C-alpha cells in the first residue's frame, strides 16, 4: 500500500535555521539521530518567540516518525512522549494513522530490505548530496500485514530495543561514577600524595599505531576480518560496508572486545571497543599496558583529549592529527602501589560491567536486526519467535 494511506500527514521541516537560543524548545537536527533513536543530550534550542513560526507546517508529537531526506539518508526515529520542539533542516516527519498501522511496526519497516530498495529506487543522486524526492514519498509502498501481526512483530523488536536501552542507561550511570572517582582521586587534588610521582602517557601505556590495511587484504581462501577505522570506532561496530583484512596479520594488530582505542587523526576520540574482533587500521592507536588497568590509561588519555583536539585543529590543513611527541608531553599522576590497588578495586568492576553490557547490547542489536530481516521478509513465521 502507498505510505500516504497509512499516515495522517507527511511533512518536511523548514528550509532555514532559526537564531540560536540558550533555552526554549528543541530544534531537531540530523546530529540528534543516534542508532535509531533521538539523542537529546546535546541539542540546539529555538526561542519560545520563534517557535510558532517554525511549527506552522507541523508540530512533532509522540509516535510521529522523523527521518532524513537529504545528505545522510536512512536515519529514522520515533518522537518520544513529552517532546517539545520543531523539525530542523533536511528532516521530515510522517504521522502514522494508528487506526491503520502500528507506529512501531512502521518505524521498524523503515529498516527492512524492502524499504531500503524503495529508497534506492527513488533516490536522486545530486552533485553534492543524495536526497529523497519528498514529492514522490507519499507513493512509496509498504508491505503491510494485518494489525495483529504488526503488533506482534513490533512487540518483539521493541522488547530487544528496550533491553539495549536499559543497558545503555546503566552504562551511562556507571561511566559517570567512574569519571567522578577519577576526577576526585587524580584531577581535583591540591598536592601530590606521598609515594606518588609525575609521568606522561608513554610511561603508563603503549600506543600501537595500526596498519595501512590496503596492503593486507584477505588472501585466497581466507575469511577476512573487518577493519577498524574511525567510522567503525565512532559507531561502535563494524558493518557490511567495513573493509576487510587478512586474519594472518600480526596478532598485536587484531583488536578484541575491551581494547582501548584512540583515534589520533581526523576525529580525535578514545573509546573502549566492544564491536567484536577486527583489524587495527592506521590513524588509530591500540592503547595497552602490562602494568596498569584499562581504566587508568583510558581516563588519562581521555583527560588530555580536549588539548589534543586543540593541537590537531591548530595544525589542520586537510586532516588534523597529533604526533607521538604530544603523548610524551601529556602529564599523568602515577599513584603508589597501595593507592593504585585501592582505586583499582573500585574502578575495575565498573569497567568490567560496562564492557559486558556493551557486548550484550551489540549481540542484542545483532539478534534484533536478524529477526527484523526475517520477520519482514516472511522468512520465519511469527509463531516461531519468542524471547
Give the label of every model feature segment.
Residues 2-19, 31-65, 82, 88, ...:
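Sequence-specific dsDNA recognition surfaces
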Residues 1-12, 139-212, 333, 337-383:
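Non-catalytic DNA-recognition/assembly elements of restriction-modification systems
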Amino acid at each position: 500500500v502507498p505510505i500516504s494511506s497509512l499516515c495522517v500527514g507527511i511533512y518536511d521541516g523548514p528550509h532555514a535555521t532559526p537564531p540560536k537560543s540558550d533555552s526554549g524548545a528543541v530544534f531537531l537536527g540530523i546530529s540528534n539521530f543516534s542508532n535509531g533513536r533521538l539523542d537529546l543530550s546535546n541539542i540546539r534550542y529555538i526561542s519560545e518567540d520563534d517557535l510558532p513560526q517554525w511549527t506552522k507546517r507541523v508540530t512533532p508529537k509522540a509516535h510521529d516518525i522523523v527521518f532524513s531526506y537529504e545528505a545522510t539518508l536512512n536515519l529514522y526515529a520515533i518522537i518520544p512522549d513529552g517532546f517539545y520542539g520543531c523539525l530542523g533542516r533536511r528532516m521530515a516527519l510522517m504521522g502514522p494513522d494508528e487506526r491503520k498501522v502500528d507506529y512501531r511496526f512502521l518505524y521498524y519497516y523503515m529498516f527492512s530490505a524492502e524499504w531500503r530498495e524503495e529508497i534506492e529506487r527513488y533516490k536522486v543522486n545530486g552533485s553534492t548530496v543524495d536526497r529523497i524526492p519528498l514529492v514522490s514519498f507519499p507513493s512509496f509502498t509498504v508491505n503491510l500485514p494485518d494489525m495483529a501481526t504488526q503488533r506482534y512483530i513490533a512487540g518483539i523488536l521493541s522488547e530487544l530495543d528496550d533491553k539495549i536501552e536499559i543497558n545503555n542507561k546503566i552504562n551511562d550511570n556507571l561511566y559517570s561514577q567512574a569519571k567522578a572517582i577519577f576526577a576526585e582521586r587524580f584531577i581535583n587534588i591540591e598536592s601530590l600524595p606521598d609515594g606518588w610521582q609525575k609521568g606522561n602517557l608513554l610511561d603508563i601505556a603503549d600506543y600501537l599505531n595500526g596498519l595501512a590495511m590496503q596492503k593486507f587484504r584477505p588472501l585466497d581462501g581466507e575469511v577476512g576480518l573487518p577493519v577498524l577505522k574511525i567510522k567503525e570506532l565512532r559507531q561502535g561496530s563494524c558493518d557490511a560496508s567495513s573493509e576487510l583484512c587478512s586474519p594472518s596479520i600480526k596478532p598485536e594488530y587484531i583488536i578484541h572486545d575491551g581494547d582501548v582505542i584512540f583515534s589520533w587523526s581526523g576525529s580525535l576520540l578514545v573509546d573502549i571497543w566492544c564491536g567484536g574482533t577486527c583489524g587495527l587500521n592506521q590513524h588509530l592507536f591500540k592503547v595497552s599496558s602490562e602494568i596498569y588497568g584499562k581504566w587508568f590509561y583510558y581516563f588519562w588519555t581521555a583527560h588530555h583529549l580536549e588539548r589534543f583536539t586543540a593541537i590537531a585543529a591548530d595544525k589542520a590543513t586537510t586532516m588534523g592529527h597529533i604526533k607521538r611527541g604530544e603523548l610524551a608531553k601529556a602529564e599523568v599522576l602515577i599513584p603508589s602501589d597501595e593507592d593504585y590497588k585501592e582505586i583499582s578495586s573500585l574502578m575495575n568492576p565498573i569497567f568490567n560491567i560496562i564492557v559486558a553490557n556493551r557486548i550484550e547490547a551489540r549481540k542484542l542489536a545483532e539478534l534484533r536486526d536478524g529477526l527484523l530481516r526475517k520477520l519482514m521478509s516472511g522468512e520465519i513465521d511469527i509463531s516461531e519467535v519468542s524471547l
